[in-house]
């Protein structure tokens, strides 16, 4: 869910070319790999399922669909070898669910290098968790960790190497660990995602995540129609005034937590 504003446009920017590693095999990872490659960056895609990744490696790219149409986007490297993918990367983008973060951190730790920036989108406080996990695994690399509260895209895979991007975020409030290096991290991330903006430390970034606010009421309060109908869109049919009222109440609690911890506006209410 793109809670921080959205656009149907493109992330096209043929400016500074950067080596970017994208980790994951889901909707967001394929969207990021295609979008960033089309923007002119040298993108390397990793997922642990080598057989599933073979569709991309065999074709040499990803089919990207968005408001501009459908086209093939070449991906410089797609590999199940994490060392190959992250070696030399300036930016490591992880658009994966929180449930995958421990496994990714364990695999990633031996390959991290000084001056790399790891960007979790979304993070759900995984930036700090992965940083401490990597350190516990013995990594001493001087890495900057950053996270925002949402995927940069509303995206859906339509096949083993095809992704449809219907929306792109226009604001990505991002927190950094360690916070004193926030400017350095955001300068790197901003070359890939111009929509990033500073929101303080990494906990502040985690508290921008609208997912825990939006999705539980939608699922719980739509349990009956979800079980009854073959198709039921929780975001349109399921977002009734009563559901929205609960969502708004939860979001006020999120903002109250931010304020209690000393974080100032903007809180980006839903």
Go through each PLM region and give its residues:
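Rossmann-like NAD(P)(H) cofactor-binding subdomain of soluble oxidoreductases
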Residues: 98-161
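Rossmann-like NAD(P)-binding element
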Residues: 71-112, 117-119
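Substrate/ligand-engaging "lid" and interaction regions
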Residues: 152-250
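N-terminal amphipathic/basic-hydrophobic helices that include classical n-h-c signal peptides
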Residues: 1-17, 97
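Small-residue-rich helix-loop
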Residues: 251-270
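NAD(P)+-binding Rossmann beta1-loop-alpha1 motif at the extreme N-terminus of oxidoreductases
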Residues: 13-66
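A short helix-to-beta-strand connector/capping loop
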Residues: 68-77, 139-144
């Amino acid at each position: 869910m793109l809670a921080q504003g959205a656009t149907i446009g493109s992330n096209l920017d043929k400016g500074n070319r950067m080596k970017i590693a994208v980790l994951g095999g889901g909707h967001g990872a394929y969207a990021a790999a295609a979008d960033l490659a089309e923007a002119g960056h040298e993108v390397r895609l990793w997922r642990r399922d080598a057989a599933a990744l073979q569709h991309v490696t065999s074709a040499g790219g990803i089919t990207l669909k968005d408001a501009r149409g459908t086209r093939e986007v070449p991906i410089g490297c797609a590999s199940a070898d994490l060392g190959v993918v992250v070696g030399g990367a300036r930016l490591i983008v992880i658009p994966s669910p929180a449930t995958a973060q421990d496994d990714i951190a364990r695999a990633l730790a031996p390959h991290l290098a000084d001056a790399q920036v790891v960007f979790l989108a979304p993070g759900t406080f995984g930036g700090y968790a992965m940083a401490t996990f990597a350190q516990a695994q013995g990594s001493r690399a001087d890495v900057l960790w950053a996270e925002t509260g949402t995927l940069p895209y509303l995206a859906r895979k339509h096949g083993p190497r095809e992704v449809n991007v219907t929306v792109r975020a226009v604001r990505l409030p991002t927190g950094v660990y360690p916070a004193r290096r926030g400017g350095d991290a955001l300068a790197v991330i901003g070359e890939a995602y111009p929509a990033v903006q500073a929101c303080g430390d990494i906990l502040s970034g985690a508290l921008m995540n609208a997912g825990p606010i939006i999705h539980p009421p939608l699922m719980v309060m739509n349990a009956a129609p979800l079980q009854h109908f073959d198709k039921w869109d929780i975001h349109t049919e399921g977002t009734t005034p009563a559901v929205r009222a609960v969502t708004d109440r939860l979001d006020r609690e999120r903002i109250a937590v931010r304020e209690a911890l000393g974080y100032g506006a903007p809180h980006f209410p839903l």
